[in-house]
Amino acid sequence: MPPWAIAQRPWVTLGQSYGGFLTLSYLSLFPEGVAASFTCGGIPHVPASASEVYAHTFPRMAAKTQQYYDRYPADVERVAALADALEKQKPALPDGSPMTVERLQLMGSDFGMKPSFERMHWIIDHAFVDGDGTLTCGASVSDSFLMRAFERTNTRTNPLYWTLQEFIYADGDTMPIRWAAAEEKAHRAEFDTLARPLMFTGEAMFPWMFEQMPELKPFKPAMDLLMEDTSWDKIYDPQRLACNEVPLQAAVYFDDMYVDSDLQLDTLSRVGNSHAWVTNEFEHDGLHGSVVFKRLFDEALNRGDLRQIF
């Protein structure tokens, strides 16, 4: 039962990131329960396709990595040296899992938010036992780095975050997903673990995670089955969305690393009564400040979309 059925009145919804995906599901399946909707960096492409999503987001991951190196040029050499050291020394993380170059790449998963570059630079600056940011040939990877790498990449408290990452694009009868992110990465030589400068990956999951990370290993048999599945429940109804009457006000972040702005705008062009505010002033987490929601709310209010509510 949808929550508004319990409340016995339509809801005004605010969807951040994946919350925007849920918003379009609500508008597809239960529009009578929604009075108005706001989304921030979270309009999925309809029709949904995991392969299409990663074809758009991997170039954005590369661009964000380059922005990081542009800000901290010395880290090009430091990250390369760290990758070489990980390959040679094969250190273990606090939970016993291997600290690989692939896991180092995964540490860029928050490059689409602030202040991720600063956090990464600080971690890289303390990656070697020397601890002063210098590069010493043969230096050991520091315990401090391994602890912080573990903290940034483990999913002990939210294992379903990665487990369901690609299945949010499984909409009705579809082709097998078959590790869409890994497939896209394999076709991009610049993301190879031996490529330099080393590229960081964003919000993307890979088969090795379910082989190496203790909290994800139990899900591997299920993942192998789900990756071949072709029949899923429908998430979105394009026809119903085209006829949508519920006011939808969306913040689209032009440089969003996670939810491609071109795909968002393509979807919104086919959703009735939708309005987009496109901005490059904010990253994916722009809602945290005091500007974004106020802008969305004021636009909807001034348009008269909230007249029956407030």
Spans of features found by a protein language model:
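Alpha/beta-hydrolase fold active-site neighborhood
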Residues: 90-229
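Conserved hydrolase catalytic core segment
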Residues: 9-49
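Conserved alpha/beta-hydrolase "acid-adjacent" motif
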Residues: 116-120, 256-263
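Conserved acidic catalytic loop of the alpha/beta-hydrolase fold
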Residues: 1-10
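A catalytic-pocket lid/entrance helix-loop region that shapes and gates access to the active site
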Residues: 32-87
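Catalytic histidine-centered segment of alpha/beta-hydrolase-like enzymes
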Residues: 258, 277-295, 306-309
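Short alpha-helix in the alpha/beta-hydrolase fold that links the catalytic acid
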Residues: 123-125, 246, 260-268
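Short beta-strand/loop motif that positions the catalytic acidic residue
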Residues: 244-245, 249-252
